[in-house]
UniProtKB/Swiss-Prot annotation:
The keyword Metal-binding applies. Glutathione binds at K22, R59, F71, C84, N85. Pfam families: Glutaredoxin (PF00462). This is Glutaredoxin 4. SUPFAM superfamilies: Thioredoxin-like. Homodimer. GO terms for cellular component: cytoplasm.
Amino acid sequence: MNDIIKKIQNQIQNNPIIIYMKGSPDAPSCGFSAQAVHAISSCGKKFAYIDVLKNPDIRLELPKYANWPTFPQLWVNGELIGGCNIILELFQKGELKKTISICDKLNS
């Protein structure tokens, strides 16, 4: 296992909610990342982020590790939830907040 994969695994394990995105929550660099961050932020939970534009090694390796080719990628409690379309679908159904609130139960 290479060092980048180990780094990704550590990030996912050490952050109950993490999004790999283009840009930052305050300044997303693509529309998909902006939409995903808006939906996640609306749930009222703190989350970590990794800007894949500033981390080209992660941008290259994460799609292979996750078996998910695009960004953003939302991970909750070590599991890949999905990209922008899935995040928005869960948000519109009211399920994203439930998915994210599981972190409170598991970490209490």
